[in-house]
Amino acid sequence: KEIENKIRLESPDLIITIDSPSFSYRLVNKLQDLRKENVKFFHYVAPTVWAWKKYRAKLFSQLYDKLFTLFKFENKYFIEHNLETHFVGHQIFFDKKVLKKKRIITFLPGSRNIEIKNNLLRLKSVISHTAKAYSDYSIYILTFDHSKSMVKNILKNINVKIITNFDEKQNILSKSFLAIAASGSISLELCKYQVPSIIVYNTHIITRILIKLFVNVRYASIINIHFKKEIIPEYLFEKFTYNNLIKEISILVKNQKKRKKQIEFMNNFSNQMLLKKKNPAEIISDLII
């Protein structure tokens, strides 16, 4: 209500909402009466209707005048509801810098505490094995301040380095030889840095059933979704096992052909995520004016 009142006081000509689809939808829905004053509504970062709740495409299209998308394949879901939709690309790939890889294996168990705990309890034996089997590699766990003590407790007596500082995490990630990461937006950063990866995810059995019932995509990684095939190995739920991961880690450490294949697709994906290699912010600016 406070934001709504502030907007009304400012009397804008244009309102642009960014991401946060539930919040943005509720806010813009309350402000539709401003159309009488010729106020326009634009949104940046489409709701992931291709993954779940496809009906949101119609709802969004009824409220907005323009939509700017990160991924080209998203456009069709909104164009069919007559919303002017523009693919502008993903900002993360505009300043892409690929660094030489070092002997680093990185584990990224997630962002929320419950997610980190669920994934890390499954990964614990894998991390322990990796630290011993690849003793000439540095093993890093990239996490957050809010979960550092929990991570330390779960992984006590295992020879790993736990990093929470943002800049240090980016530095480690960019130089990693291999990453084992929880499903999520981190896959875009791994793609940006061209780090061969394995995607994992574990959750409660009830949540698992709901995901299988309501999620509309076959894959978790955005690269796999984009290319409609498994480029990045995924071990989700019941496939997230010690034996599966130990085998896959061994393949991606030793098999140069497999690593090269991932990197080629990552590079291809990165190039497709920019429109004519232009800064997405500049493209949006041109479309607004």
Could you tell me what each predicted segment is?
Residues K1-I289:
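Nucleotide-activated sugar donor-binding and catalytic core shared by glycosyltransferases
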